[in-house]
Amino acid sequence: MKQILIVEDDNLLNKTLTYNLELDGYTITSVLNARTAAESLKTNIFNLVLLDINLPDGNGYDLCRLIKPEHPDTVVIFLTANNQESDQIRGYEAGAVDYITKP
């Protein structure tokens, strides 16, 4: 079964993503900050990380840079309100394969 890590500090969006992806049969670990995400990554292998950029204890760019060397096969997709082209470029440079802006 596919394992997904959701790193999103908006509790409602976090729960909505978790609910819908679990309905589709995915195993979800959802966290609200970078520290807890880093801890989860030490003990789990995820196929996908859905990652917000603006987190209360750090940013998604730095977390993505930590993920990729240790978990090169893990796909990272940014899901963020940051919609500037420069933000997207930073996301791809950090190792993400896609960048989705939320309203």
Predicted regions and their residues:
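N-terminal/domain-start alpha-helical segments
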Residues: 1-103
